[in-house]
Amino acid sequence: MLGNSAHFGRWDILQFETAGKTGLTLRYIIGDATRPEGTGPQLLVHVCNDIGGWGRGFVMALSKVSRKPEEAYKRWSAGETDQPFQLGEVQFVYVSEEFTVANLIGQHDIARRNRPTAEPPVRYEAIRRGLRQVRAWAQTRGGSVHMPRIGAGLAGGDWGRIESIILEELVAHGLPVTVYDLIETRGEAPWLPDRSAWPPG
């Protein structure tokens, strides 16, 4: 794993590169995933739950940028589309000509303070199946893939395991992937999340 840091105007970027089978990289930067860097078609991937809940975590920031992903997800969860609403499915929502959001169902239910789950809501195989759909979409359109640390926030997943899935399903197939950490404290290590307690607050 190689580390480099630089200042790029809008963001302080802390970049780590993990070599995939193709020699391409999974890139980490400090920035806002709802406003991906670069040009050309951009696909923003995030993880949703399978009960139709949209109201905590990353989706709140996403809805401030555009309500389209939220509105499409709610129609989907209400059975108003032909696509099955189930783990491993992905809904592609066109926000603008160059920006699409992938609502990937990779979480079963949600964690609640008054009803702890027997295991974290994350479902790794659902994320893997969803990323295969993401791969097909991005390869067809020649786009870049962007995401927060999917499945490792409220879903309670282990990022090391999820990172391996991303490398296998996206990077190893020649897709450029950027992972965003939204961190304000300079020098904090974004790759060392606190997993001391479950469920998350």
Pin down the residues of each PLM region.
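Macrodomain-like recognition of ADP-ribose-binding/processing modules
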Residues: L2-G201
